[in-house]
C-alpha cells in the first residue's frame, strides 16, 4: 500500500511537545465478524457463547483431506459492506494462504486475501462537533480495501496451571478486514471513525458490531511527525476492543513516541498491546512484513468471480444508511443537525424514533426520544433495545399532550410511571386522576385565591409585569400541576391587568 497524505496540517490538532509541535497519524485495520449462520469455508455454526469446541467442523479442525467451500452469504455480506462504504467492488478476487504457526490455527495458515481483495477503495465521512458556535466539521476518511479472511481460534492460558487450552469455536468464522488510509489526525477522529463504521455495518446487517463479544476489533497504527514532514515509523496496537480504549491507546502511544523522539531516540516498527488497566501500551513483538507470511494463492480455492448483475441485485436491497437518513430527518422533519445525528447514530434508535414520529410532529418526537428516553436509559445503564417504554407508549404520551388531556409537566410524571411500572398511558391518566384541569371556573377560583393571598406580589407585578410568572407557578402548584398552563397564564394576566 502506498501511503498518501491527503490532509492539510491543522494547528488545533497538534500535540505540543518540549521541542515544538507534533502531529499524530492514525490508520486502522478493523476486523468485523460477518453476520452469517455458518463459517466462511464450513457449515459449522457461528453462534456466540456455545460450549468450547462445539461449533467445530472437520474443516475448522484441519483434518486431513478436508477442503474449504466458500459460503456465498459471506461473499454477499462483504459486497454489501463495500457498497455501504461507497467502495469499488472487485468482480475478481483471490484467496491466499497467510502462513504462520499458532496453537489456535490448526491449518498452520490463515485463508485471507492479499493482492486481490474483494473490495477496493472507498470512504467514510465522520462528523466532529458541535463546537461552541454549534458547527460540525465533516472529515472524509479513505478506505484502502476490504478483504475476507478466516478468524483464528482462541487460546486460553488461565484454565490450568501447566497447560493451555484451545477453543476452536471461532476458528474459520468469516471476518471482513476493513483497512483505512492513514487519514486520521487525532484520537477523537479515530473514535468517530470507529463509531461511524460500526453504525454502517449495523445498518447494513453485515456485522452486529458487539465489541464486547469480539465481533469488532481494531488494530490501530500510530505514528508521529513534525507538521508537514513525511510519515514517521508506525507502531501497531493489536486487538483494541472498545472505542474508549482506542482513544486512550492513541493518546498514550503518541505521547510515548514523542518522548522517544525528543530524547534523540528512534521509533522501532513493532506490534504493541494496550493495557486498559494501566492505560498504556507495551511491546508484544517486532512488526512482521508481508514477506514474513509467505503469501501464495490457496490451491484449494478458485478465484472468486461475479458479474455486474450480482452487485446490482445486492445494491438494490441496501437499506437507508445513516448519512442519508440524517439528511432526510433534517430536510423533511425540520430537525437540527445535532438532533438528527443523535437519532441516526444507532439503527435501533432511528427505528424507534421513526415509529414514535409516524403521524406526529417530528421535533416533538425527537425531543422526547433524545431528552427523556435516551436520558433515562443513560441513567439506568440500558441501551435502546432494553427500553421499558415502547414507541407506542411514548407516542401515546405525546398524543395526550396534543389533545390537551395532560400538560407537559404531567407528561413528565406520566413518562416516569410508564418507565418504571409500564402500562397504558391513557389508562394511567384516567385511574390516577392526572387529567389536566380545563374548567375555566375552577382555574379562575384558584387564580383569585392566590392573588388575594399575596397583595405584596400584586404590587410588584405592577412595577415589573414579568413577575406574573410567579402567580402562574403558584396556581400550577395549587392545582397539582393539572391546570392548563395556557389558561392559567391568560387568567393571571387578565386579573392583574397585564396587556398581552
UniProtKB/Swiss-Prot annotation:
Q: Which GO terms describe its biological process?
A: glutaminyl-tRNAGln biosynthesis via transamidation; translation
The molecular function terms in GO held by this entry are: asparaginyl-tRNA synthase (glutamine-hydrolyzing) activity; ATP binding; glutaminyl-tRNA synthase (glutamine-hydrolyzing) activity
**What reaction does this enzyme carry out catalytically?**
L-glutamyl-tRNA(Gln) + L-glutamine + ATP + H2O = L-glutaminyl-tRNA(Gln) + L-glutamate + ADP + phosphate + H(+); L-aspartyl-tRNA(Asn) + L-glutamine + ATP + H2O = L-asparaginyl-tRNA(Asn) + L-glutamate + ADP + phosphate + 2 H(+)
Return the Pfam families for the record.
GatB_N (PF02934), GatB_Yqey (PF02637)
* Superkingdom of the organism of origin: Bacteria
Q: List the disulfide bonds.
A: none
EC number(s) of the enzyme? 6.3.5.-
Q: Which PROSITE patterns match?
A: GATB
Q: Does the keyword Hydrolase apply?
A: no
| Annotated keywords | ATP-binding, Ligase, Nucleotide-binding, Protein biosynthesis
Q: Which InterPro entries match?
A: Asn/Gln-tRNA_amidoTrfase_suB/E (IPR017959), Asn/Gln-tRNA_Trfase_suB/E_cat (IPR006075), Asn/Gln_amidotransferase (IPR018027), Asn/Gln_tRNA_amidoTrase-B-like (IPR003789), GatB (IPR004413), GatB_C_1 (IPR042114), GatB_Yqey_C_2 (IPR023168), Gln-tRNA_amidoTrfase_suB_CS (IPR017958)
State the function annotated in the UniProt record: Allows the formation of correctly charged Asn-tRNA(Asn) or Gln-tRNA(Gln) through the transamidation of misacylated Asp-tRNA(Asn) or Glu-tRNA(Gln) in organisms which lack either or both of asparaginyl-tRNA or glutaminyl-tRNA synthetases. The reaction takes place in the presence of glutamine and ATP through an activated phospho-Asp-tRNA(Asn) or phospho-Glu-tRNA(Gln).
- UniProt record similarity statement: Belongs to the GatB/GatE family. GatB subfamily.
Output the PANTHER family linked to this UniProt entry.
Answer: GLUTAMYL-TRNA GLN AMIDOTRANSFERASE SUBUNIT B MITOCHONDRIAL AND PROKARYOTIC PET112-RELATED (PTHR11659), GLUTAMYL-TRNA(GLN) AMIDOTRANSFERASE SUBUNIT B, MITOCHONDRIAL (PTHR11659:SF0)
Which NCBIfam families does the UniProt entry name for this protein? gatB, PRK05477.1-2, PRK05477.1-4, PRK05477.1-5
Q: Which HAMAP family match?
A: GatB
What binding partners and quaternary form does the record give? Heterotrimer of A, B and C subunits.
Q: Please state what the protein is called.
A: Aspartyl/glutamyl-tRNA(Asn/Gln) amidotransferase subunit B
Organism this protein belongs to: Rhizobium etli (strain ATCC 51251 / DSM 11541 / JCM 21823 / NBRC 15573 / CFN 42)
Amino acid at each position: 500500500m502506498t501511503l498518501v497524505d491527503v490532509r492539510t496540517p491543522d494547528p488545533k490538532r497538534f500535540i505540543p511537545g518540549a521541542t515544538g509541535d507534533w502531529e499524530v497519524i492514525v490508520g486502522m485495520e478493523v476486523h468485523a465478524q460477518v453476520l452469517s449462520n455458518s463459517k466462511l469455508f464450513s457449515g459449522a455454526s457461528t453462534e456466540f457463547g456455545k460450549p468450547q469446541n462445539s461449533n467445530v467442523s472437520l474443516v475448522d479442525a484441519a483434518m486431513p483431506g478436508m477442503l474449504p467451500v466458500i459460503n456465498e452469504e459471506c461473499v454477499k455480506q462483504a459486497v454489501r459492506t463495500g457498497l455501504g462504504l461507497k467502495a469499488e467492488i472487485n468482480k475478481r478476487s483471490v484467496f491466499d494462504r497467510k502462513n504462520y504457526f499458532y496453537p489456535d490455527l490448526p491449518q498452520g495458515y490463515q485463508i485471507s486475501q492479499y493482492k486481490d481483495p474483494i473490495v477496493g477503495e472507498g470512504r467514510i465521512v465522520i462528523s466532529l462537533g458541535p463546537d461552541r458556535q454549534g458547527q460540525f466539521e465533516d472529515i472524509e476518511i479513505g478506505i484502502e480495501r476490504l478483504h475476507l479472511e478466516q478468524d483464528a481460534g482462541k487460546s486460553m492460558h488461565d484454565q490450568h496451571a501447566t497447560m493451555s487450552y484451545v477453543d476452536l469455536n471461532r476458528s474459520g468464522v468469516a471476518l471482513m478486514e476493513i483497512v483505512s488510509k492513514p487519514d486520521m489526525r487525532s484520537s477523537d477522529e479515530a473514535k468517530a471513525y470507529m463509531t461511524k463504521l460500526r453504525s454502517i455495518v449495523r445498518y447494513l446487517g453485515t456485522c452486529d458490531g458487539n465489541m464486547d463479544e469480539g465481533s469488532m476489533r481494531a488494530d490501530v497504527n500510530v505514528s508521529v511527525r513534525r507538521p508537514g514532514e513525511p510519515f514517521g515509523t508506525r507502531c501497531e496496537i493489536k486487538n483494541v476492543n472498545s472505542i474508549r480504549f482506542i482513544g486512550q491507546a492513541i493518546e498514550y502511544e503518541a505521547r510515548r513516541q514523542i518522548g522517544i523522539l525528543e530524547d534523540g531516540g528512534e521509533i522501532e516498527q513493532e506490534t504493541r498491546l494496550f493495557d486498559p488497566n494501566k492505560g498504556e501500551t507495551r511491546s508484544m513483538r517486532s512488526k512482521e512484513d508481508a514477506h514474513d507470511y509467505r503469501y501464495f494463492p490457496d490451491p484449494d480455492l478458485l478465484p472468486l468471480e461475479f458479474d455486474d448483475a450480482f452487485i446490482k441485485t445486492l445494491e438494490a436491497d441496501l437499506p437507508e444508511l445513516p448519512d442519508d437518513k440524517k439528511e432526510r430527518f433534517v430536510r423533511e422533519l425540520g430537525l437540527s443537525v445535532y438532533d438528527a445525528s443523535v437519532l441516526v447514530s444507532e439503527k435501533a434508535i432511528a427505528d424507534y424514533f421513526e415509529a414514535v414520529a409516524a403521524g406526529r410532529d417530528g421535533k416533538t418526537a425527537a425531543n422526547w426520544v433524545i431528552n427523556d428516553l435516551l436520558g433515562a436509559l443513560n441513567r439506568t445503564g440500558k441501551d435502546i433495545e432494553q427500553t421499558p417504554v415502547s414507541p407506542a407508549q411514548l407516542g401515546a404520551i405525546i398524543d395526550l399532550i396534543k389533545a390537551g388531556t395532560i400538560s407537559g409537566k404531567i407528561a413528565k410524571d406520566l413518562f416516569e410511571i410508564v418507565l418504571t411500572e409500564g402500562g397504558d398511558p391513557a389508562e394511567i391518566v384516567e385511574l390516577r386522576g392526572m387529567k389536566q384541569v380545563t374548567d375555566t371556573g375552577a382555574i379562575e377560583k384558584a387564580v383569585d385565591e392566590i392573588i388575594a393571598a399575596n397583595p405584596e406580589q400584586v404590587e410588584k407585578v405592577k412595577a415589573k409585569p414579568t413577575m406574573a410568572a410567579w402567580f402562574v407557578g403558584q396556581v400550577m402548584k395549587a392545582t397539582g400541576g393539572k391546570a392548563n398552563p395556557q389558561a392559567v397564564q391568560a387568567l393571571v394576566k387578565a386579573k392583574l391587568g397585564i396587556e398581552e
